[in-house]
C-alpha cells in the first residue's frame, strides 16, 4: 500500500559498465559511470563507436538506452516511438497505463534530440522513456489517485520525483494505474478499472504500484516510478518479476501541491518514492536521479548514495520464518536459490532469526491503521467503492485500536525496533527475506473477506510491510519462475545503505538472469 491524505493522498548490481572516457569523474554518490559521461561530454554527432544494443528498442535497459542516445546510435524520437508502439500493442490487455502522454512525449523527444545536436551537458536519463504512477502531482493534470471524486485536484507543479526525473532528461510516456487512495495491495478502482499481470491474468499485479510493475515488465518504458508505505514497490515487483528498491525514509523527496492538507507524521516516516525496472542497474541509476534535493520536502536527507564497504566477505542473514507462517515450497526453494547465488558471489549466508518481525509488523499495522482512522477514514469512505471498504475493514480487523497513551507507546516502540535492527546490521549487513511466503493471490482477493486480507498481509507479505515502520531500504529482485509465475526475494539493509541492498540484488540477478526476457517470449 502507498497512502496519502484522504482529501488528496500522496502517497538500486554494482556500478554499470564504464564507458571509455578520460573525463568520466565519479562524484560522491555516483553510481552509473556510463551515464556520467553524458554529463561531462555530449557528442553532437554519431560517435564512431556508437552501437545499438541487440533486440527491439523497447527491450533495452535504461542504461543501454541512455548510452545509445548519447552516442547517437539512436535518436530520442525513435526510442520514444518504439515504446509508444509497445504501449499500444500490449496496454489494451493490461490496463497498466491509464493516461496516455504520447503527444507530449514525442514533443519532448524532439526537443531532446535538438538539445543533443547543440552539444553540451545531457542528463543521466536523456531521452529515456519512463512512466509515473498516478498518485503524485503531474503539472496541469488531476491527481486522481484512483478516485473519481479527485477530479478537481489539479497539480500546480510536478512532484519532486517527477521534476528530478525530467531534469535528468527522462521522457514520461504515460501515467500508471493505482487503487483508490493507493491503499490496497491490488490494483483496481472505479475510475480506470483492473490492471492485469502480464505473466498471468489470474494473479494480481500487486499494488499499489501495480500499474507501474505491470507496465515496465511488459516493456512499456524502461523505468517505472512508484511509492511504498506498506509494500507498494516491493509487492508489485515480486508479482510482475521485476526489480525495485524501497529507499530509506527521506532519501527521495516527496510533496504534492494539489493536496488540501499536510500528510500525518507517521505517513512521512514510513513511506518512500522509488523506481521499478527490469534490471537492477536501472534501479540504481533511477535511484540516483530521483534522490536529488527538493526544498519542498523538509524530511529529505542529503545522505551519500554509497557508504563504506564492509570488511571481509559480507555476512548475509537468511531470515528464519516465524512458525505461524505457512511457507510455500516454491518460495522456500527460491530463497535457497537466492542464498546459493549470494554464496557463489562471495557472500557468507547463515540462517538467522531477525529481530522480532512479528512485533515490528504489528507496530506498523497499529500505527498506520490508527493514524488513518483518525485523520482520513471518514473522508475516504465517502468517496470510495465497496471493494475499498472491504479491503480497509480487513486491515482494521488486524489492528489494535489505540488511545493517545497507547499511540505514544507504539511510536516509542518503533524506536526500539529500529535500534534492534541497526544493531543486528552490525553483524549482518544484509538480510535475505521473502517478499511473500505464499503463492501470488488472485487479482481481487482482498475483496473476498476480511480474513483473506489478513491472510495476504499478515500471513503472506509480513516481511514486506514490517520494513516500512523501520524506515529501512528494501530491494526486491526476481529469482525464479514457478508454474510460469515469478518469485522475488527481498534484501534489507541498514539506513541509507541502498548500495548494499542493490549490490546483493545484482549478484543474484547476474546468476538468475532477467526474468522479463522470458515473459516477452510468451506475450508476443
Swiss-Prot record:
The active site is at residues 133, 208, 232. It is an enzyme of class 3 (hydrolase). The keyword Hydrolase applies. It comes from the Bacteria. Disulfide bonds: none annotated. Residues 1-26, 34-54 have a biased composition (Basic residues). Belongs to the amidase family. Residues 1-56 are annotated as: Disordered. This is Indoleacetamide hydrolase. Pfam families: Amidase (PF01425). SUPFAM superfamilies: Amidase signature (AS) enzymes. GO terms for biological process: auxin biosynthetic process. The lineage of its organism: Bacteria, Pseudomonadati, Pseudomonadota, Alphaproteobacteria, Hyphomicrobiales. Pathway: Plant hormone metabolism; auxin biosynthesis. One of its GO terms (molecular function) is hydrolase activity. Its EC number is 3.5.1.-. Keywords: Auxin biosynthesis, Hydrolase. It comes from Bradyrhizobium diazoefficiens (strain JCM 10833 / BCRC 13528 / IAM 13628 / NBRC 14792 / USDA 110). Hydrolyzes indole-3-acetamide (IAM) into indole-3-acetic acid (IAA).
